[in-house]
C-alpha cells in the first residue's frame, strides 16, 4: 500500500526558455513539482508563495501533501530587484509550463488549479482576470480548472504602489488591479480570506468588492469564503484544507 501512495518531488526545474540570458530570471524562475508516482490523470495545484512580492520562497503547503494530487510550487522574481510586471509575467510563464508539461508526469491538463497565499493570491487573481499575461506564453487563462486565491489583493498590489513611490494604505485601481479587469466569463473563482476583523486592512472588503463587481456583470462562477477566527497568516492552513477538498470534488 505504501508504494501505491508514493509521492515524488522534482526540485528546481527551470520554467523559462533555455536561451534566457537574464541571470536573475535564471536564478529565480524555478519550480518544484510534488506528484503521486503511481497514479494517472491526477489534478494539479500551482501554488504561489506569499511575501508581498518582496520575499518568500517556494514550498508545498503541508495541508496539500498526500491528497492524491500534484502541487507545483513556484519561485518568481521579487521587488525591488525586479519591478512590476516581472513577477506577474513569471507567474504566467510558470502556469503555461504546467500546461505544456503536466501530462509527462501523469497529470490532467484540464485539471490544473491556480492558487497562492497573500502576494501569491494576488498573482493568481491578476492571471485569472487579465488574460494577456498567460496568452503571451501560449496559454488560455480560462482553461484553468479554477482559481483559489487566499487573502489576495484585488486592487493594485501595495508593492506596485510602493515601486511608484505612492503612500501606503490608499488604494489604486488601474490595469494591475484584478477588480479593474473583472470579466463575465472566467474560470471558476473561489476567493478565500481570513476574518474581516483580524485580516490585513481592507483585505476581506477588497475580495467582497471583487465578488460584488463580478456578480454585477453577470459572472456566475465566483464564491467568497471568509474564514472566521483566522488572521492573515493563520488562514493559510484552513484555506488549504478547503482548497484540497474543492480539488478532490471537482468534476
What are these regions (language model features)?
Residues 41-51:
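Short beta-strand element of the alpha/beta-hydrolase
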Residues 208, 215-251:
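C-terminal catalytic histidine-bearing segment of alpha/beta-hydrolase fold enzymes
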Residues 3-40:
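N-terminal cap/lid segment of alpha/beta-hydrolase-fold proteins
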Residues 48-50, 98, 193:
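The conserved beta1-alpha1 loop
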Residues 82-103, 126:
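Alpha/beta-hydrolase active-site loop
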Residues 57-74:
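Short amphipathic alpha-helix adjacent to the substrate-entry channel of hydrolases
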Residues 138-160, 168-212, 216:
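The feature captures the conserved acid-bearing segment of alpha/beta-hydrolase catalytic domains
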Residues 13, 99-163, 174, 178:
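Primarily recognizes the serine-hydrolase "nucleophile elbow" in alpha/beta-hydrolase
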Amino acid at each position: 500500500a505504501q508504494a501505491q501512495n508514493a509521492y515524488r518531488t522534482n526540485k528546481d526545474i527551470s520554467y523559462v526558455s533555455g536561451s534566457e540570458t537574464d541571470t536573475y530570471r535564471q536564478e529565480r524562475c524555478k519550480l518544484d513539482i510534488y506528484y503521486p508516482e503511481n497514479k494517472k490523470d491526477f489534478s494539479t495545484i500551482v501554488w504561489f508563495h506569499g511575501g508581498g512580492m518582496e520575499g518568500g520562497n517556494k514550498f508545498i503547503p503541508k495541508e496539500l501533501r498526500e491528497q492524491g494530487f500534484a502541487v507545483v510550487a513556484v519561485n518568481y522574481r521579487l521587488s525591488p530587484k525586479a519591478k512590476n510586471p516581472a513577477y506577474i509575467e513569471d507567474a504566467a510563464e510558470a502556469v503555461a509550463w504546467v500546461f505544456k508539461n503536466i501530462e509527462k508526469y501523469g497529470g490532467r491538463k484540464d485539471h490544473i488549479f491556480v492558487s497562492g497565499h497573500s502576494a501569491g493570491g494576488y498573482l493568481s487573481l491578476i492571471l485569472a482576470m487579465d488574460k494577456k499575461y498567460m496568452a503571451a506564453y501560449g496559454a488560455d487563462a480560462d482553461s484553468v480548472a479554477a482559481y483559489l486565491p487566499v487573502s489576495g489583493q484585488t486592487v493594485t498590489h501595495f508593492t506596485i504602489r510602493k515601486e511608484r513611490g505612492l503612500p501606503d494604505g490608499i488604494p489604486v485601481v488601474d490595469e494591475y488591479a484584478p477588480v479593474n479587469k473583472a470579466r463575465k466569463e472566467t474560470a471558476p473563482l473561489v476567493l478565500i480570506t481570513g476574518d474581516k476583523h483580524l485580516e490585513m486592512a481592507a483585505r476581506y472588503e477588497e475580495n467582497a468588492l471583487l465578488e460584488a463587481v463580478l456578480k454585477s456583470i453577470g459572472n456566475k462562477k465566483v464564491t467568497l469564503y471568509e474564514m472566521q477566527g483566522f488572521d492573515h497568516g493563520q488562514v493559510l492552513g484552513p484555506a488549504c484544507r478547503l482548497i484540497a477538498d474543492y480539488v478532490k470534488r471537482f468534476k
